[in-house]
Amino acid sequence: MIYGVGVDIVNIERVERILSKNKEGFVKRVLSEYEQVLFAKKGDSSTYCAKRFSAKEAFAKALGIGIGKIVSFQDLTICNNKQGNPYFIFSAKLCLYLVDKNIKKAHLSLSDEKFNAMAFVILEIEN
């Protein structure tokens, strides 16, 4: 059964401007430590950051809360499996919250094109 759905879209040029002004601050605030390591290796860093920002916002929307109340950007890490499909890794704190809400699965889809990055999240609970 679906617990919640969240979607978010981010303008990549906006993220690019933020990175040009305060790269270190934005990266430390939005990306987990693991994501920061991958970010350092990326050629298209603004798209990478925009997709992660969008995914974390969409996740918070699917929970029905905003970033900062229960979940922070640091509580979520976005990884990719061998086929390139994105998935979430949760902090221990967030895992406890999800268990309390009976949320068993999180589905994530990411997309980008020239100007925008988008994320779509579905959270499932057990019947």
From Swiss-Prot:
Q: Which residues bind Mg(2+)?
A: 8, 57
**Coiled-coil annotated residue ranges, if any:** none
User: Source organism's superkingdom?
Assistant: Bacteria
* Enzyme type, top EC level: transferase
Q: Which cofactor does it need?
A: Mg(2+)
**Which Enzyme Commission number(s) are listed?**
2.7.8.7
Q: Name one GO cellular component term.
A: cytoplasm
Sum up the protein's function in the record's words. Answer: Transfers the 4'-phosphopantetheine moiety from coenzyme A to a Ser of acyl-carrier-protein.
Q: Which family does the similarity line name?
A: Belongs to the P-Pant transferase superfamily. AcpS family.
Cited NCBIfam families: acpS, pantethn_trn
Tell me the protein's name.
Holo-[acyl-carrier-protein] synthase
Report the source organism.
Answer: Vesicomyosocius okutanii subsp. Calyptogena okutanii (strain HA)
What phylogenetic lineage does the species belong to?
Bacteria, Pseudomonadati, Pseudomonadota, Gammaproteobacteria, Candidatus Pseudothioglobaceae
| Gene field | acpS
